[in-house]
């Protein structure tokens, strides 16, 4: 009586994040690939925006691009495997988004990017919580 045609209970289907774990993981990975890709393109992203000032003080643009693409690659692998690799990939994705958010905030506290990527990082840590406790 409490099941839907797909075998889920009503409580499960009422939870908007019930089946969204893979979608969240995919979105975190895609955004990280996009960030790494933008930094790889010719031209200097760091020199065109003050928001990237803090990142430029830490490392060159190519280093950030390599780091973001490496994290995104591990994230993509985590989409297809289970176990510790999946959890490690989510830790990497969430932490990279969080680091990016903090750097944007330090470079331009009044910008909107820091809040946006901060929310994305929180979504990543929420996914990690779900993956760790199999919720």
Each language-model region and where it sits:
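Membrane-water interface at the C-terminal end of transmembrane alpha helices
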Residues: 122-135
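Hydrophobic transmembrane helix segments
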Residues: 21-66
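Membrane-helix boundary connector in multi-pass membrane proteins
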Residues: 82-117, 132-135
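Membrane-interfacial loop-to-transmembrane-helix junctions in polytopic alpha-helical membrane proteins
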Residues: 10-23, 52-56, 60-63, 78-88
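Canonical alpha-helical transmembrane segments
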Residues: 68-82
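Alpha-helical transmembrane segments of polytopic membrane proteins
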Residues: 59-68, 113-121
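Alpha-helical transmembrane segments of multipass membrane proteins
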Residues: 36, 73-77, 101-102
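Cytosolic juxtamembrane helix and N-cap/initiation of the first transmembrane helix
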Residues: 1-34
């Amino acid at each position: 009586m409490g099941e839907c045609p797909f075998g889920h209970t009503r409580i499960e289907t009422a939870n908007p994040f019930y089946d969204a774990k893979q979608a969240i993981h995919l979105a975190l990975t895609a955004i990280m690939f996009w960030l790494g890709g933008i930094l790889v393109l010719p031209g200097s992203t760091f020199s065109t925006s003050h928001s990237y000032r803090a990142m430029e003080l830490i490392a060159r643009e190519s280093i950030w691009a390599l780091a973001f693409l490496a994290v995104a690659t591990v994230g993509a692998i985590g989409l297809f495997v289970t176990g510790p690799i999946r959890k490690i990939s989510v830790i990497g994705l969430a932490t990279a988004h969080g680091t990016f958010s903090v750097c944007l905030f330090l470079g331009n506290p009044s910008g909107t990017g820091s809040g946006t990527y901060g929310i994305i990082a929180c979504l990543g840590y929420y996914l990690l919580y779900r993956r760790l406790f199999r919720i």
